[in-house]
From Swiss-Prot:
The keyword Cell membrane applies. GO terms for cellular component: plasma membrane; proton-transporting ATP synthase complex. NCBIfam families: atpA (TIGR00962), PRK13343.1 (NF009884). The record marks 362 as: Required for activity. This is ATP synthase subunit alpha. It comes from Staphylococcus aureus (strain NCTC 8325 / PS 47). It catalyses: ATP + H2O + 4 H(+)(in) = ADP + phosphate + 5 H(+)(out).
């Protein structure tokens, strides 16, 4: 049989073309020391800051301290299977998390892996966790309202899309409740919500997820959970993972609301990491860059200009104080970074004023320009009225013989406090808020006993739904304040049918 040279060369050519070299060159190091979620690695001379490295058992680590003789790596997972002398490989990748629509309705860990038992997440797109914040020229000033559904906030400390508004207060004062209520109020508003739970009990996270599911809010919400039992590197990374998922939507022209619950625990996790990495401690044993830890996170919340699609990320960071001390290190840092704060007071909470917002110390530095005209007009004097009531209240304790003007101020103040009370998980549409605040400021509640105020409001809302729909629709659709005559007619009509308690 004759051997044909063409056939042999064609065969060889196809073999060469299909040949795949299995050999790859990777930078390899050795574990010198391991413990408390930190590994010291020798030999990774070319590793980048923030690069992922892979241990022999598949667990990933994050390169943090780049020193002459070794690299300090924080381990993103269980470290019990890693021992001294183990091999460590560079991956050449910085940390990334999956992003996209597929994450909506899911509960994931800070690495973007599902932890809700509902199967894998089929997304192919990823984004780097650490990213420079949007530049000044790509932004636009805050001018669209983000309605929380909470009267005391929408009237006194309004929030706009693209704003960073801090929620600060002692433990058990209703901080998470405000955040969850705000998420519930975004239903049908076209806002995607991201709830980042940092260092909370698993049972607490589960309860919040169930609350969102029952209200139908998981249809537009992503939950990123790093519970108290997770290693501290995951608690440190969780907020950055959350905002990275949010940026994907923002750059596609959508509106995002992100809640960090809470950044005090993230700062504590970062302090733990820094001390284990032998970085020099500063005030309250925090490292020197704890301000940068939060500023680079919160600066990623923005309102993009119209050329970039006009998307936004609104951030609601939560900070827990000790005994109301807002002058501690982390609270003062975050207050200076954000565009205002909602200060919750335990004294108010325990006296039955819920949400326990201290109107005097709560501010919104940019939200005023985003507030709808109707609310701005009816709630204009509300803060001053509340402040003068608090002042008169303490003054009135010393004597009962008050002049008529002071007595009327006190009575109006009591009704103002009652109107601003609200049950949890019951956000109120803005048109109903405008209606009750108008009734309050125009004196329609002055002859209603204080004990009846809540019932008056509930019944007014039900009555208005069927008898004053035009009025409510006008506020909802235009944002402007209808004629006073329409309000007066509606409220007077309702008062005829309202029965006061004896």
């Amino acid at each position: 049989m004759a051997i044909k040279a063409e056939e042999i060369s064609a065969l060889l050519r196809s073999q060469i073309e299909n040949y795949e070299s299995e050999m790859s060159v990777t930078d390899v190091g050795t574990v010198l020391q391991i413990g408390d979620g930190i590994a010291l690695i020798h030999g990774l001379n070319d590793v980048m800051a923030g690069e992922l490295v892979e241990f022999h058992n598949g667990v990933l680590g994050l390169a943090q301290n780049l020193e002459e003789s070794n690299v300090g790596v924080v381990i993103l997972g269980p470290y019990t299977g890693i021992t001294e002398g183990d091999e460590v490989k560079r991956t050449g990748r910085i940390m990334e998390v999956p992003v996209g629509e597929e994450l909506i309705g899911r509960v994931v860990n800070p690495l973007g892996q599902p932890i809700d038992g509902q199967g894998p997440i089929n997304t192919t797109k990823t984004r780097p966790v650490e990213k420079k914040a949007t530049g000044v020229m790509d932004r636009k000033s805050v001018d669209e309202p983000l309605q929380t559904g909470i009267k005391a906030i929408d009237a006194l400390v309004p929030i706009g899309r693209g704003q960073r508004e801090l929620i600060i207060g002692d433990r058990q004062t209703g901080k998470t409740t405000i955040a969850i209520d705000t998420i519930l109020n975004q239903k049908d508003q076209g806002t995607i919500c991201i709830y980042v739970a940092i260092g909370q009990k698993d049972s607490t996270v589960r309860a919040n997820v169930e609350k969102l599911r029952q209200a139908g809010a998981l249809d537009y919400t992503i939950v990123v959970a790093a519970s108290a039992s997770e290693p501290s590197p995951l608690l440190y990374i969780a907020p950055y993972s959350g905002v990275t998922m949010g940026e994907e939507f923002m750059f596609n022209g959508k509106h995002v609301l992100i809640v960090y619950d809470d950044l005090t625990k993230q700062a504590a996790a970062y302090r733990e990491l820094s001390l284990l990495l032998r970085r020099p401690p500063g005030r309250e044993a925090y490292p020197g860059d704890v301000f940068y830890l939060h500023s680079r996170l919160l600066e990623r919340a923005a309102k993009l200009n119209d050329d970039l699609g006009g998307g936004s990320i609104t951030a609601l960071p939560i900070i827990e104080t000790q005994a109301g001390d807002i002058s501690a290190y982390v609270p003062t840092n975050v207050i200076s970074i954000t565009d205002g704060q909602i200060f919750l007071q335990s004294d108010l909470f325990f006296s039955g004023v819920r949400p326990a917002i201290n109107a005097g110390q709560s501010v919104s530095r940019v939200g005023g320009s985003a507030q709808i005209k109707a609310m701005k007009k009816v709630a204009g004097t509300l803060r001053l009225d509340l402040a003068s009531y608090r002042e008169l209240e303490s003054f009135a304790q010393f004597g009962s013989d008050l002049d008529e003007f002071t007595a009327s101020k006190l009575e109006r103040g009591k009704r103002t406090v009652e109107v601003l009370k609200q049950d949890q998980n019951k956000p109120l549409p803005v048109e109903h808020q405008v209606l009750i605040i108008y009734a309050l400021t125009k004196g329609y509640l002055d002859d209603i006993p204080v004990v009846d105020i809540t019932r008056f409001e509930d019944e007014l809302n039900h009555w208005a739904e069927s008898n004053a729909t035009e009025l409510l629709n006008e506020i909802r659709e235009t944002g402007g304040l209808p004629d006073a005559e329409k309000f007066d007619t509606a409220i007077n009509e309702f008062k005829k049918s309202f029965s006061k308690s004896e």
